[in-house]
Amino acid sequence: MSSQNSKDRISAKTRSLKPSGIRKFFDIVAEMDDVVSLGVGEPDFDTPWAVRDEGIYTLERGKTFYTSNAGLKELRVQICKYLERRIHVSYDPLHECLVTVGGSEAIDLALRALINPGDEVLVPEPCYVSYTPCAILADAVPVAIPLKAENEFRLTPAELEEHITPKTKILVLPFPNNPTGAVMERGDLEAVAKVCLEHDLFVLSDEIYSELTYTGRDHVSIAQIPGMQERTIVINGFSKGFAMTGWRLGYCCGPADVIGQMTKIHQYAIMCAPTNSQYAAITALRDCYGEVVEMRTSYNQRRRFLLHAFAEMGLPCFEPFGAFYVFPCIKEFGMTSEEFATKLLEKERVAVVPGDAFGESGEGFIRISYAYSLDQLREAMERLGRFVKGLRGR
């Protein structure tokens, strides 16, 4: 009996997906010593103690059974209260809210619930690496919208209009942005919303970094704009703002008909998000906002330190007002982002992420995360400054 070779065994769609440029680079880092890594987008803070304590308590009390597919009712109520308080949009916790395994699952579910084969999904780049693969797996056609540094990597209505075709169905709106740290203010969102309404586009608004904005720029959701709540899925979670990456808990809110279909897919693929994490998240939303503010204050201190360091070494970098990343430009050195990152790693043992890992428009930039201590950032900037001087021949 003949056996299939590996190529025949694996679907063509899966084979077409490229491995994450971030993970590929950090597989190399894992084999090296004395590396200061600024590449991972994960808070360096411990999960707030009250959240951990609730997790321990629920385990001790044996609260380890399935929840409803959509998640604990009490958690969904708290999520909807939180969103009403933070973005001033009201949702029905019973029909318009779904608890997911991280925000990433919510992205996947939304695309699978909305897409018919051949529909186009607009993806502003540079961006988080999962949108395009998830669109492909949902049988959509991802269409990149290259964002520009001169616009502070914000999406303009003209850029959006330019990429709309009769097949366009969904716009992914990833702000505050990973990797650039860009934010969209209300005026920006109103202009984008006007285009979405004119062309009947649905929006996936990935707001996972909504709690991490600086210098008084409060996060604004496109769901706040008149006419947009009924055509927007708001995606968020606990990983970034509450330092709960390993708890794997996210959520989405939107129109009941779409959330219902997403819940159906979630039911068959996942059943429910981790029960222990759900109980802990109730405590996070109810009791731990003070810790979120403290973490945000610390991130802002680090952000300002890095911007000052780049100015000192003459490395161009627009000021990011969200997330915990900076995206300096390295075009002056006449090498690709990957070449720059590789040489920096080899010569100075500093790990950053090449900008093109987040899309072609990220070429010529590197992503640096400031979810690290000031001591680590100081050491990294000393090494980076030395590396830049060497490239300039000084």
Question: Which residue ranges define each predicted feature?
Answer:
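PLP-dependent class I/II
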Residues: 1-16, 28-32, 36, 40-58, ...
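Conserved nucleotide-sugar phosphate-binding/catalytic loop shared by glycosyltransferases and other
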Residues: 62
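Intrinsically disordered, tyrosine-centered linear signaling motifs in cytosolic regions
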Residues: 65-66, 209
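Conserved N-terminal alpha-helix of the aminotransferase class I/II PLP-enzyme fold
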Residues: 66-101
